[in-house]
Each structure stands twice: as structure tokens, then as C-alpha cells.
Amino acid sequence: MASLGLFLCLSSVLLMSLCQVPTAIEDERKASHVYIAYMGALPSKISYSPMSHHQNILQEVIESSSVEDYLVRSYGRSFNGFAAKLTESEKDKLIGMEGVVSVFPSTVYKLFTTRSYEFMGLGDKSNNVPEVESNVIVGVIDGGIWPESKSFSDEGIGPIPKKWKGTCAGGTNFTCNRKVIGARHYVHDSARDSDAHGSHTASTAAGNKVKGVSVNGVAEGTARGGVPLGRIAVYKVCEPLGCNGERILAAFDDAIADGVDVLTISLGGGVTKVDIDPIAIGSFHAMTKGIVTTVAVGNAGTALAKADNLAPWLISVAAGSTDRKFVTNVVNGDDKMLPGRSINDFDLEGKKYPLAYGKTASNNCTEELARGCASGCLNTVEGKIVVCDVPNNVMEQKAAGAVGTILHVTDVDTPGLGPIAVATLDDTNYEELRSYVLSSPNPQGTILKTNTVKDNGAPVVPAFSSRGPNTLFSDILSNEHSKRNNRPMSQYISSIFTTGSNRVPGQSVDYYFMTGTSMACPHVAGVAAYVKTLRPDWSASAIKSAIMTTAWAMNASKNAEAEFAYGSGFVNPTVAVDPGLVYEIAKEDYLNMLCSLDYSSQGISTIAGGTFTCSEQSKLTMRNLNYPSMSAKVSASSSSDITFSRTVTNVGEKGSTYKAKLSGNPKLSIKVEPATLSFKAPGEKKSFTVTVSGKSLAGISNIVSASLIWSDGSHNVRSPIVVYT
């Protein structure tokens, strides 16, 4: 009887244990995430089936008869890999499998949210060839577009290029034409834009010319992209919550196979290694096909080492202002005019209104909250202009009956169109207005309509644009270009560019201004496409070099972070088509550089799609990658003696001779050997070394810069030289 009791007890324990096993597995399955398995280049075997291979791998990992339920995406058009729903233990098992380079979670990337091309020199008189320009295809990986916009009209554009291999799979309520020749969506049921970001970036890069554009009369002009006759292919990966990594990689997989020439992607995710970053992975394979990829460095502000998208095969773009600024003046009751900034299209006709500030704006909040225009506080502002210590609640002010608002701002950016009259004042002018309000028994004022004036101080890098140095590749300069991004106007679903969906709060507009490095990035994509039209046989690295070495040098006195803010300088597209010399980088050079960063030979072979050996002889340090700029991180407490090795290719005239010219900081001693390069013919290559010596930088500066210019009298090939601690 005792034995029977023991048996029943043990049976119960065993039964409970068996019941708990499925529960544990189910709990782990509920906690699964989407992971991306990157498997490098596609095998060369004709019989290879990526989908079958990926399903077989999952069969081993998941141990389920229906792995199709867990496979999210299979990448197999341009490179190899897949995305799948995996538990933590399944992910760990996958990491060690043959042919898998890396496994990483599909994280959410964020969007980096008319005069600009003329300021860059790409106006109506630029040297474009219509029949060639219309052969260039710009791929836009973003949030879709609004296809009805005039910026996406195919007026004046011929048949679709024969090289195009893509399709128009735009989904619900989306139609392509000879301008927008392709569309794919990886989220929702349509490639149609929902928040204007994608329409803005697409029209900035390659929008058709639209004359007589303005934002309700402000900044009238012609909206255009860098290649107005170029084609656009749309890859919608973003939704309001963000842009998943597995979708981004799928877009790269398709875009490369579709045959785009240039890709623009204004997204970032702060990834710390290139083999777990969908943008770095996708753009690497794009580079091997000659496709240029431009990316935004982000909007993290002036703190150092916050720049995003740092892989050296990318063109990383910071923001820069143009020579146009928008002035919105405030006039107080004493007729004192205070210069402000904003885009205000409301005409108050000079009428002065009561100014509501603090107690006169609210009777249900503290003085401090009311002065900050806190939510729920503005209950006595009807028919008044509200004065706010911080930018806050403009839509709430409109709902409360305010006719306008004056905001205190500390950065240089210009706020966008508002639902009521809006002006912003800097510290000095805001304090003067505040003093008037507090001292006057009946303070009044008005906000004037915006005027567009010339900004002779441009270009500068605005405060929001992310700064270097490069945290992934310490001896490679990040923020390669500063580009017009500060308030381009474009098709706002339309710099001006398009909007299309009229998403300006409280107003309906077709074209609008947007800011952020998101808007700088497609400008450089447009420039790259422009260079591609005139130099169709150039490699991606040659185009990048041409854009970098011909950029306008910028003034470090206006940007304390110097090259960490503006990189090589401000893009100069009309000169970039004829740089004289270029620094070319082959795929093998990048792979040899990865060797020096301790990536395995096996992993690099998989990336390369063939046998690749990392030897001591083949390893290429970051410092000696044939990059168009030169950068080195050094110890602050010791003197430095650094050598850079470079090779340039002649893309100019035969029989040309270039001499080295140096400009820079007396703290650095720079020697170039040889100091003269002579070329007999185009395509000829010449090598040289640059040796930089300097004393300790301790207590002096965290960045010291100079520049090397190779000049033949008509070309000036400029490379920044940066030493930092």
C-alpha cells in the first residue's frame, strides 16, 4: 500500500513536470522577437534557392514542422539572409551555424526629421543633359510618397529606362508613371505617404520642377530636386512608430536588384557595429554594384560623438544653412521692432493685440506654469497674442482663441508654419519684450508677416545636427558633408518641397518647409545623381570622393566642433563633376580594413561571397584606407607622429601636374611626399604619404585640423587633416 502511494505521488510529480514543459516553451515563444540572420553575399550556384535554404536552417533551429509561420522575410535578390521570429535560445543556436555572419534584433529606426539647389550652384543654368539625366534612378527608402504631387509629375520625361528591373507594386490607391517608375511597400497596404517625410525627401532628391511655389506667399520660387528629370523608385519601410530593421534590409535587397543608381535613406538607429546594422549591410552590397548610398547623421545636437550611420562606404550628411533666412518681426506697443524667426503667413495687418503673459493668460494655474504656457493653463487668451517662456502648445492656444504667439527659443532653427501667427525671439530680444510686458499696464503688440532676406553668414551647421567624431571607425572622419538641410521647401506630401497630404497643423498647404538632417541627406543624393548623369561610369567611391574633395571649406569660427560638425565642407555640385583627382576604394580595401578590426576570415569570406584570407600583410588600418579625408585619434598627453598613405586617380586632363599645398594649424607639422604628382593620361594612379607631427594637445584643444590641397591650377582637390584626442 505504501509502495502504491509512493508510485501515485511520483506519477503526479512526473505528470506535473510534463505539463509544465509545454507551458515554459509557450511562455518563451510569446516572448520571441524578430531577429535578422545576415549571411553575406549570395552563393554563385545557379541552383541555389535562398528561401529553401533559410527554411532548412529554421527547421534545425525551431524544431517545428511549420517554419513558414516564423519566417518573416527571406533576402535573396542582392544578398543572403532572412528575418524570423525566434526565442532567445533559438537565436543563440542560430548564431553558431555555418554561413551565418551575424544575428541581431530587428530594432526600430527613426526618421531624422526652393532655394537650396540654387545656393549650391545647381540652378537652371547647371550643366545637365536631359536625355542622360532621365536615365538616372534614385531609390528612396523612407515612408512612401504622395504620387499626385506635381513634384512627381512625368511631364517632359521620356520612356522608362530599359535598365530598370523593378516593378510598381505600390498597393492600394497608388499609381506609378514615367517619373515614379517603381514602388514597393513593406508596411501597411500602400506605398502612399502618411506623414509627408517620404514625399519631402523624394522630391528633394529628384522632384520635377514646379514653378511659382510658395508657402502661402512666403519664399516664392521653383521647387526642384537635384535631378528634375531623374526617375524615382519608392520603398516604404516606415510607419508613424518607426522603421523596422528587417523592412529596411528588405528594401535594400529589392532596390539593388531593381537597378537604382543612388539610394537616399534618412533614418538612423544608433547601431554600434556594421555587421549588425541593416543600413551598413545593405549599403555595402549596394556599393559593390556601384550604387551610392546617402544617409543622415542625425539630429542629436552639439554633443560630441553622437553622429549616426558611420560606415565608410556611406555618404554621411550633416545639416547646413543656405543664404536665405526667414525674418518675422515683432512690434510692441511702443513701436519697438524686435527681429524674430519663424515662417508666419498670417497677416495681422499691423493691428496691435493685447499681450497675454503669466497671470493675464491664465487664472487657474501658477504664474510659473502660465508663463511657460503649460497645457491646461491658457484659459484667458481669446483675442490676444500669447507670450511664452518656452515653445509650447500652439494648437492649444489656437483652440483657446489666441490670434498669435511669441515664443522664446535658444537654438538657431526656425519653427514651421503654425495654425496662428507665430514668431520666435532669441534671448536678448525676448527679454526686451518680457520687460516691456511686465512694466506696461496695458501691453500690446503685433506679429508681422515673414520676410525672406539674404543671410550673408551662411553656411553654418545648425545646433540640431549631430556631431562626430566617428565612434565606430575612430580614424575616419564622420559627417563627410554639410548640406543644405535647414528649411528646404519641398512637396510636403512638398528646402520648398512637396507635402501632398496637407499635414501642417491647422492649415492646408501643398508645399512646405522641413528641417533636420533628413532633409540634408536627399540633397546630397540629388548631387550624387547629378554627378552620375555626367560621369555614369564612375564607381560609388569615386563619386563620393568627388563630392568630398570639391566641397567648400567652412569656417571653424562659426562651428566650434569644426570638422566634427561639417566634415569635408559644404557640397559644391557643379565642381564635383570635374574634381581632377579621385580617391578610389575597392570592395577588397573595405574587407582588408575589416580584417584589422578583428572580423574573422570566415565571416569576411561570407560577406564577400568568396574565399578571403586575413593576413598580416593584407590588413589595412583605418588610417590607411584610401579615404578622401585623413583623421587620427591620438593620446592627449603625448606628441604624435602619424603617417597616412593615399593613392589618387587622374580623372582630368592628360599631361597634368598637381602640387601639394598645405593650410592649417601651426600646432601641426605636415610633410607630403612626393609634393608633386604628374599624370600622363586619365586613369593613371599616383601614391603619396602625408606625415603629421605635433606636440601634446593636452590643454590646447580636443581637435586640431589642417588641409591638403592638390592643385594643377584649375582643380583644387582638398582633403581635411584632423588630429583629435
From Swiss-Prot:
Enzyme active site: D142, H197, S518
Keyword Protease attributed: yes
PTM comment: The C-terminal propeptide is autocleaved.
Keyword line: Autocatalytic cleavage, Glycoprotein, Hydrolase, Protease, Secreted, Serine protease, Signal, Zymogen
Domain Peptidase S8: 116-577
Class of enzymatic activity (EC top level): hydrolase
Propeptide feature ranges: 25-112
Signal peptide interval: 1-24
Glycosylation sites: N173, N364, N555
Cellular compartments per GO CC: extracellular region
Disulfide-bond pairs as recorded: none
The keyword NAD appears for this protein: no
Subcellular location: Secreted
EC number(s) from the headed UniProt entry: 3.4.21.-
Matching PANTHER family: PROPROTEIN CONVERTASE SUBTILISIN/KEXIN
Name listed for the protein in its UniProt record: Subtilisin-like protease SBT4.2
Protein species of origin: Arabidopsis thaliana (Mouse-ear cress)
Gene: SBT4.2
